[in-house]
Amino acid sequence: MISKINGKLFADMIIQGAQNLSNNADLVDSLNVYPVPDGDTGTNMNLTMTSGREEVENNLSKNIGELGKTFSKGLLMGARGNSGVILSQLFRGFCKNIESESEINSKLLAESFQAGVETAYKAVMKPVEGTILTVAKDAAQAAVEKANNTEDCIELMEYIIVKANESLENTPNLLAVLKEVGVVDSGGKGLLCVYEGFLKALKGEKVEAKVAKLDKDEFVHDEHDFHGVINTEDIIYGYCTEMMVRFGKNKKAFDEQEFRQDMSQFGDSLLVINDEEIVKVHVHTEYPGKVFNYGQQYGELIKLKVENMREQHREVIRKEQHTAKPKMETVETAIITISMGEGISEIFKSMGATHIISGGQTMNPSTEDIVKVIEQSKCKRAIILPNNKNILMASEQAASIVDAEAVVIPTKSIPQGISALFQYDVDATLEENKAQMADSVNNVKSGSLTYAVRDTKIDGVEIKKDAFMGLIEDKIVSSKSDQLTTVTELLNEMLAEDSEILTVIIGQDAEQAVTDNMINWIEEQNPDVEVEVHEGGQPIYQYFFSVE
């Protein structure tokens, strides 16, 4: 029985919850409704939770309130994608509810889950039932009722998991698209994985990391990032230190959590990877010898590597003196746009974007990524163009925590972003620009061509793995094995009698022959439509289209 949870136990709950989510990230990704090759939910929740875990591991406290603040900050700044932002808000409310406590009981644990739900619902403009929000809500409500009958946090957490699982299984009855595809909600599944890790920790158990067999001959490739380091003397830990230890039978038994905590005292940038035979370690430290001595407790040192990062930094400075490196532009009003593909970035720059953040379907930037750009620009005002529905909430979260006056234009595609930026008026106020840029989003129809990563049926369209898919906004309107056929079916749906301009943005995987045939088809079938073609260079999507 566990009647009280202190900071140490809560830290272990976070660590085990993060590990269980990490182990199941691919499974969560596989539940994504749309079979596009992004797999964002599991990936984004995992990266978000990992950010919270790392913050906790670097700032351990026996006081649960203090630890909660640390965890919440890590989640907030590391949040990626809508699922990651919602996860961060669930625990933001949870941690806010315990901030004045040194330890909590079952009743406060349940109330904190409920507080998290209330915070998350407020953070979402239009909450949708049948999602992670529903699973969190149902589990929290059940927890509050159960806490009246038990003081055992283990029993409470077991009940929460039962109710969360029941809620998860019911999500297809609340969201028609889940039932059509035959899956449960991916975000809800990710949250359940976190809760299951919590229970493991409460029971004194450990979630073992899923790892591939390690290569005994290679270290993890590491390129030192000296961004933000002005003087060599500012480098606190001067030696990039790596070691490989083969576990010994008569040596100390290896416990990954203990190993990580001990190693973190030697420096920063810690990376630990292990299997049954060896452990690989990467750490930046001032005393490599201490790292090696510690490693010998567990077995034989089979590979060692030390690099002097101060000397490397001096070399970087010497090279930079000969090669001018542009600094981040300081502006009054920063126009920050998320972009995927060099060509698309150049389009945004030519239209007046001051800062480009690389990101998109396969890697959503975190809240912190956006915050850093705003802060480093030293701007007074900021306009953020997410250009992806899954980056919208992280953008709004970033805008809410920076000192600059920041607004988010709700662009959900690259074409919408281009259309919005075209409306920017340098002489208008921030609010005027926000209104006219947001209004322009409604005047453009966006389309895209990509491929399917699995068999499914959605929006009434039968889809086969590796077939091409044509989408208008988020709706799949065509899917065929032939690329040109899929494109022409898509454009037939997009183009109307009053369509005037069709913009085509070509991706890095587009075939020239298909592009030529597509343009010829457009000119023959729609002679009154003006066609603009740009090289975008975007991955995943062979083409982006916009119709105005």
Curated annotation (Swiss-Prot):
Instruction: List the SUPFAM superfamilies.
Output: DhaL-like (SSF101473)
Q: Name one GO molecular function term.
A: glycerone kinase activity
Q: Report any Pfam family annotated for this entry.
A: FakA-like_M
Q: Which domain of life is it from?
A: Bacteria
PROSITE patterns noted in UniProt? DHAL (PS51480)
The DhaL domain extends over 8-200
The record's InterPro entries line, in alphabetical order, gives:
DegV_domain_contain, DhaL_dom, DhaL_dom_sf, FakA-like_C, FakA-like_M, YloV-like
One Gene Ontology biological process: glycerol metabolic process
| SMART domains tied to this protein | Dak1_2, Dak2
PANTHER family, per database record: DEGV DOMAIN-CONTAINING PROTEIN DR_1986-RELATED, PHOSPHATASE PROTEIN
Q: What is this protein called?
A: Uncharacterized protein SAB1090
